[in-house]
């Protein structure tokens, strides 16, 4: 037939088929409704959400653009801008919902949230960390390192499932090794939190603490406790807690999966709120650190523990 393969054209076609990064064809919206918009990504976890989502969007042929929703750009006005730019996909990071979300017409958009489904009334796909599973894993690893009286200090909030995972981890343990968790009320003063921790330490006598509250190391230091000499310490989110050992919640993966879910909705032409919300939980991974060394139980203490 006289046909000769064009090597350059064949190479370009192969590159297009196999490249992980596709040409950018459209935009996706990241809605930031924080009163101080810059504060959102000052949290390392949430900045990683953005990084993971941005990379995944580029690989799928999209660009992730941030839109700050406030008095100057209310949700109703933003909707017109998104329509004009043909933006049909919205990714909502953690934080407050945009004012006016109840009356906004979501029917033209595919929507995914990067937050606990218990923190929102929007029926969407929600991608978040497996808080209960992470707490159970952390408590188990702490026991494997020789700690027997592992306590939990956290914020009293039903939407946060760390405490639930901790309580499940206590089931089947020796009753003398079960500790009552300390749940601090959000909004109370640091001094009230400090006094609560002081009483709890006296009542429960933990040899290690699992926490999701970044102020715990400083509070323990003020009370005269040394980490790790006096007790071990592990965090349920090491990126935003000044604690070296604990759970890495894999936030970049949370952002990546959020985009993956959003692109799937767009491809299937699924628009608007869902009839039934769906939860995608991402498991964390354990990170060793100096705040939780392996504990050596002295023979005398070991004997007294089994008496």
Show where each model-derived region lies:
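Flexible loop/hinge segments that line or gate small-molecule binding clefts
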Residues: 93-136, 235-246
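Flexible loop/turn connectors
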Residues: 194, 198-307
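Hydrophobic alpha-helical segments within soluble ligand-binding/sensing domains
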Residues: 123-152, 190-198, 249-270
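Hydrophobic structural packing positions in well-ordered secondary structure
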Residues: 28, 53, 90, 111, ...
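Periplasmic-binding protein-like
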Residues: 29-30, 84-94, 149-155, 181-186, ...
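An alpha-beta-alpha
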Residues: 137-174, 272-292
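Short beta-strand elements in bilobed, periplasmic/extracellular small-molecule ligand-binding domains
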Residues: 54-69, 151-153, 163-193
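Amphipathic helical "hinge" segments at domain boundaries
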Residues: 1-80, 85-88
């Amino acid at each position: 037939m006289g046909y000769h393969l064009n090597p350059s054209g064949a190479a370009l076609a192969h590159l297009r088929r196999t490249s992980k990064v596709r040409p950018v064809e459209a935009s996706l919206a990241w809605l930031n409704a924080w009163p101080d918009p810059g504060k959102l990504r000052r949290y390392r976890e949430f900045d990683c959400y953005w990084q993971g989502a941005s990379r995944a969007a580029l690989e799928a042929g999209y660009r992730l653009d941030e839109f700050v929703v406030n008095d100057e750009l209310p949700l109703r006005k933003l909707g017109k801008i998104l329509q004009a730019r043909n933006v049909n996909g919205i990714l909502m990071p953690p934080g407050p919902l945009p004012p006016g979300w109840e009356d906004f017409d979501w029917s033209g958009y595919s929507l995914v949230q990067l937050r606990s489904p218990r923190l929102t009334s929007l029926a969407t796909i929600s991608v978040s960390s497996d808080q209960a599973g992470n707490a159970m894993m952390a408590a188990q690893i702490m026991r494997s390192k020789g700690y027997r009286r592992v306590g939990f200090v956290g914020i009293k909030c039903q939407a946060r499932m760390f405490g639930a995972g901790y309580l499940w981890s206590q089931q089947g343990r020796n009753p003398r090794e079960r500790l009552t968790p300390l749940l601090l009320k959000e909004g109370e003063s640091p001094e009230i939190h400090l006094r609560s921790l002081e009483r709890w330490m006296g009542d429960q006598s933990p040899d290690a603490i699992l926490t999701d509250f970044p102020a715990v190391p400083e509070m323990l230091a003020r009370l005269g406790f040394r980490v790790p000499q006096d007790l071990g310490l592990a965090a349920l989110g090491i990126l935003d807690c000044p604690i070296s050992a604990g759970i890495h919640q894999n936030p970049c993966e949370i952002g990546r999966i959020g985009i993956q879910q959003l692109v799937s909705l767009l491809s299937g032409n699924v628009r608007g709120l869902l009839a039934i919300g769906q939860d995608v939980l991402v498991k964390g991974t354990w990170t060793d650190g100096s705040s939780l060394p392996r504990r050596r139980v002295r023979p005398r203490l070991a004997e007294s523990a089994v008496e």
